[in-house]
Amino acid sequence: MALNRIVLFYGFTPITDPDAVRLWQRALCEKLGLTGRILISKDGINATVGGELNAVKQYVKTTREYKGFHGIDVKWSDGGAEDFPRLSVKVRDEIVSFGAPGELKVDANGVVGGGTHLKPEELHRLVDAKKERGEEVVFFDGRNAFEAQIGKFKDAIVPDVATTHDFIKELESGKYDALKDKPVVTYCTGGIRCEVLSSLMVNRGFKEVYQLDGGIVRYGETFKDQGLWEGSLYVFDKRMHLEFSDEAKTIGECVRCSAPTSKFENCSNPSCRTLTLYCTECASSPETLRCPEGCAA
């Protein structure tokens, strides 16, 4: 039986001809039988693809041959081509859609002026060092707010954002001005959103900004469920969520009955389809699989 895997990676580097990279990446994935999503811009690449293990290995090896992609940090997880509906390779103004394509500065070394990178072990050392000095490290979630319903760092601030486009308005709202003189650690799934978010925060006067290198994925690989992370990790494919060990807590609650759950379901209203947490029992009927307070759509 063939082994299958999913890889997640990104790379910030100047790309002079994004469309040429798009054509190359599509041809490579089609040749290897891979599916997934790849976004390319003048600032780099953001990819999640899956397929047969040897094919994925060849894909990673070939992708790293591109000058700007030599040092990409690839995260591996269980899954395969069947976890994605198709192969999508597109050129966009941004590889993460914050709505600020002109603000991000990128050079051959990556994002210019972003937060200080912290490996998982360095994060723990920072927390301990600040604690000894009577300071508290603030964890700042760089994902869409709903993702944090099933997993987040302990006591993290979860901004009220439906998409990454909402972050700039949220940062400029004044809600977080009290954090501008505090040590703030941004985190997200694989690290890419925090590359941009941390630079946006620095540009708006946050003085001590860090970003979790490799994101929640790398942290979970390192500490499983024995560290500062609680719950499951939301992922944007058919798996919907993943856990780092059998000891993972279930912190999500069914919107109907408050039973523990980590499973998101789409609202059964075809014109709505909002993702909401439901337990297995409440998700079993179209009548209960509706937004409890009425659909927004």
UniProtKB/Swiss-Prot annotation:
Top-level class of the enzyme under EC nomenclature: oxidoreductase
What keywords is this UniProt entry annotated with?
A: Oxidoreductase, tRNA processing
Top-rank taxon:
Bacteria
User: Where are the catalytic residues?
Assistant: C188
| Pfam families from the UniProt entry | Rhodanese (PF00581), Rhodanese_C (PF12368), UPF0176_N (PF17773)
- One of the protein's GO biological processes: tRNA modification
The Rhodanese domain covers 133-228
According to its UniProt record, which reaction does this protein catalyse? uridine(34) in tRNA + AH2 + O2 = 5-hydroxyuridine(34) in tRNA + A + H2O
GO MF term set? oxidoreductase activity, acting on paired donors, with incorporation or reduction of molecular oxygen
**EC assignment:** 1.14.-.-
Q: Which InterPro entries match?
A: Rhodanese-like_dom, Rhodanese-like_dom_sf, Rhodanese_C, TrhO, TRHO_N
What's this protein's function? Catalyzes oxygen-dependent 5-hydroxyuridine (ho5U) modification at position 34 in tRNAs.
Of which family is this protein a member?
A: Belongs to the TrhO family.
Would you tell me the protein name for this molecule?
tRNA uridine(34) hydroxylase
Organism classification: Bacteria, Bacillati, Actinomycetota, Actinomycetes, Micrococcales
